């Protein structure tokens, strides 16, 4: 039977295999893809794949290359199954992939395979074909790596690779990546995954040796035809890969990072011009004097703070401060996003979830304070440099005085010093200058939590250190200890702010919260409201309270109102009296014109309504 097929029926084989494989791919595309997209275009891609699959199969039949045929089919099966990973996981990750999306995922590895096979037909001699195989195997390895990453990321987060994940990666470095791996991925699992990746790639490379063969003697006309086929396959491969989810995600991430970099350049240009901007200066110069301190926490969720009702006493200073009438603690504060750069670029600028101002056109609180004649100081324990820090670093770099205590270039959350190192820098600020804005950026509770506090004096939890703890509990204990240390640092900062600088107002909030579990973090793809639950409190001096009784009364009256930290810019502008330009009173938390409530307040850049946080707010919450 086989000899009959090879001798006389190879055309029938080509037709049968083409139709059968087309039917299988069509069915898979229909089952896994949601309605939508250009269905006819999807069908054309699938048919061309089936046609090539049938053609190569028929050729191997005709030449009686049984091992090559079996190896080829095994390779097609392996790559085909890998191509289904994203479409299969998509519904579980609540991601919609239509039939066109699914067809691009299915087509990419098969066009990669057919490109390699066709190229080998054009290269004479075993050495040339081996070179083609090796190059092809490298691309297969990279493709397998992408698919394994899909599986691993889904296993950790129950989500597909997304722009959120890529932006988090862009804000990550080798040190932080190793920390994340050590916390979230057991070493054995990681070793097995890497071994499986290389084993699969190596097996595909080995079996490809059987079918990376072609006609020994190819006529000029045939060779031209093969060249045209190869050109088509390369073009199809590039196009199909560019439309896959991973490629689209990378492209969107690049656009976002590009916008951050553009913002950085805009801030740097504005830094040189804002002081000489007579329009701004004339509008703002009448603002009253005052010393204002803004403290920005890191990864601190109010759900793990004793002052907000958490059962552990890990905020002794803040708990005591909450009883002092000079402090106002706000119970329902949220961050605008779950990641630092996204959150703080909104918190420190005009841009917020409730307006349409492009980020590149948004003035920062530093710009406005400097234009009004305030001396500005930036004191930070976070990295200044690196792609992930450029927007925040650019804002801080506009200050008159800068103290960047984290001198690791591009290392994000790696620091050799605890946050208490910032206090001596604050003590150096001249208290005689009564027109100042000082921003302090803490390292706070960023993972790994155990690196954020000195164990001497702050390793309080667990209270009973003889008991065996679950991995969840270990993380909770370490996080709570870091919160305890942040509370201590805040007490030191407030001591200097009140007794040395005689500050008129001190505002504290965290950039975002944290989900504290065995696998902790603030990944937007795993969104839970705890990731955006943040502490927010304000200290006002008795003198400030006398000068601004209406604002002080509004603070006390609104302590249970909803607030998102992207309104910090307008709120601080209002407190400083910078209300004549680049100011929106509807986003000033203490303004009479403040118009935000549960009906219109959001988080995650306007994608999630706060009213969905039923666990924290209940079903009948109102500003009262």
Give the role of each language-model region.
Residues 2-53, 59-76, 94-97, 102, ...:
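Membrane-interface soluble catalytic domains
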Residues 299, 511-512:
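Active-site metal-binding loops of divalent metal-dependent hydrolases
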Residues 341-342, 531-533:
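Short, solvent-exposed loop/turn segments at the edges of secondary structure
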Residues 349-350, 408-411, 474-475, 550-556:
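Flexible glycine/proline-enriched surface loops and loop-helix/loop-strand junctions
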């Amino acid at each position: 039977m086989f000899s009959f097929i090879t001798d006389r029926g190879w055309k029938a084989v080509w037709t049968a295999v083409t139709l059968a494989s087309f039917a299988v791919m069509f069915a898979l595309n229909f089952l896994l893809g949601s309605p939508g997209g250009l269905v006819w275009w999807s069908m054309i891609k699938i048919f061309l794949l089936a046609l090539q699959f049938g053609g190569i199969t028929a050729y191997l039949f005709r030449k009686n290359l049984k091992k090559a045929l079996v190896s080829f089919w095994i390779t097609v099966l392996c790559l085909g199954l890998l191509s289904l990973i994203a479409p299969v996981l998509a519904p579980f990750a609540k991601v919609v992939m239509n039939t066109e999306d699914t067809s691009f995922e299915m087509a990419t590895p098969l066009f990669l395979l057919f490109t390699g096979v066709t190229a080998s037909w054009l290269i004479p001699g075993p050495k040339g074909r081996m070179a083609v195989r090796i190059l092809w195997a490298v691309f297969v390895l990279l493709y397998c790596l992408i698919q394994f990453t899909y599986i691993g990321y889904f296993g950790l987060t129950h989500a597909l690779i997304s722009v959120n994940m890529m932006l988090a990666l862009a804000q990550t470095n080798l040190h932080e990546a190793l920390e994340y791996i050590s916390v979230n991925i057991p070493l054995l699992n990681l070793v097995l995954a890497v071994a499986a990746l290389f084993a699969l790639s190596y097996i595909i490379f080995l079996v490809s040796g059987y079918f990376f063969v072609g006609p020994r003697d190819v006529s000029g006309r045939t060779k031209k035809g093969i060249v045209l086929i190869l050109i088509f396959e390369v073009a199809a491969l590039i196009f199909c890969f560019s439309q896959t989810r991973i490629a689209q995600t990378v492209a969107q991430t690049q656009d976002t990072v590009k916008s951050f970099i553009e913002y950085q350049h805009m801030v740097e240009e504005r830094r040189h011009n804002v002081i000489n901007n007579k329009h701004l200066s004339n509008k703002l110069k009448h603002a009253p004097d005052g010393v204002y301190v803004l403290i920005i926490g890191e990864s601190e969720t109010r759900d793990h703070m004793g002052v907000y009702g958490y059962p552990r006493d890990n905020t002794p200073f803040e708990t005591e401060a909450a009883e002092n009438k000079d402090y106002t603690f706000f119970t329902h504060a949220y961050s605008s996003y779950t990641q630092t750069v996204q959150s703080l670029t909104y918190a420190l600028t005009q841009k917020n979830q409730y307006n349409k101002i492009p980020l590149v056109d948004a003035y920062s609180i530093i710009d406005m304070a400097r234009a009004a004649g305030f001396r500005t100081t930036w004191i930070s324990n976070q990295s200044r440099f690196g792609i992930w820090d450029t927007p925040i670093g650019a804002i801080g770099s506009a200050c008159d005085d800068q103290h960047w205590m984290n001198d690791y270039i591009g290392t994000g959350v790696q620091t050799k010093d605890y946050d208490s190192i910032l206090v001596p820098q604050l003590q150096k600020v001249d208290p005689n200058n009564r027109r100042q804005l000082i921003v302090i950026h803490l390292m706070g509770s960023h993972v790994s939590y155990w690196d954020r506090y000195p164990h001497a004096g702050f390793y309080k939890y667990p209270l009973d250190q003889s008991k065996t703890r679950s991995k969840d509990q270990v993380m909770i204990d370490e996080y709570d200890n870091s919160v305890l240390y942040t509370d201590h640092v805040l007490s030191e900062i407030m001591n200097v702010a009140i007794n040395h600088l005689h500050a008129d107002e001190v505002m504290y909030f965290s950039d975002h919260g944290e989900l504290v579990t065995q696998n902790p973090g603030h990944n937007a793809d795993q969104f839970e409201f705890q990731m955006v639950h943040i502490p927010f409190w304000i200290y006002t001096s008795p003198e400030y309270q006398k000068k601004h009784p209406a604002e002080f009364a509004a603070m006390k009256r609104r302590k249970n109102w909803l607030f998102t930290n992207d309104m910090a810019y307008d709120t601080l502008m209002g407190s400083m009296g910078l209300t004549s330009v680049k100011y929106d009173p509807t986003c000033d938390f203490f303004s009479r014109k403040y118009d935000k409530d549960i009906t219109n307040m959001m988080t995650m850049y306007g994608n999630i309504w706060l009213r969905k946080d039923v666990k924290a707010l209940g079903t009948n919450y109102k500003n009262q």
